Amino acid sequence: MRECRSHDTILVQINPVERQGTPRSARDILNRLNEVSFNAVLLKELRMIAMLRQVAEPGNCEGALWAGMRIHRVTSEEMSLLGASSKLIAEWEFLCKLRDLGRSAAESFLAAHASDIGQRSSYDLDTLLKGV
């Protein structure tokens, strides 16, 4: 944060935080375990940022950086449906599909939140602190 002049951070989330249903097969359980493990670290970091933003003193140089931080999140429903095995696919057609899904997600995000960038967070980190 200290090395960057931008106060906006854009999180491109490709692993879903929640999935419908309960995994039943060993493969599905392992895939979900990998997603939960990755997301646990991400959510811990985001919660830490949310807490720092709440307690930071805006007048303090370091506190001003945290207090002024703006968070945005780009998600894709279609990408969240992809299983863990998709991370091993290196075929050109599939990579082009991922590129197109990413562009579509970015366009949707910008249509909804372009005016937020540079002004305010479009992702409410404080919701992550509920129950903490």
Residue ranges: model-predicted function:
Residues 1-132:
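Non-catalytic peripheral regions of patatin-like phospholipases
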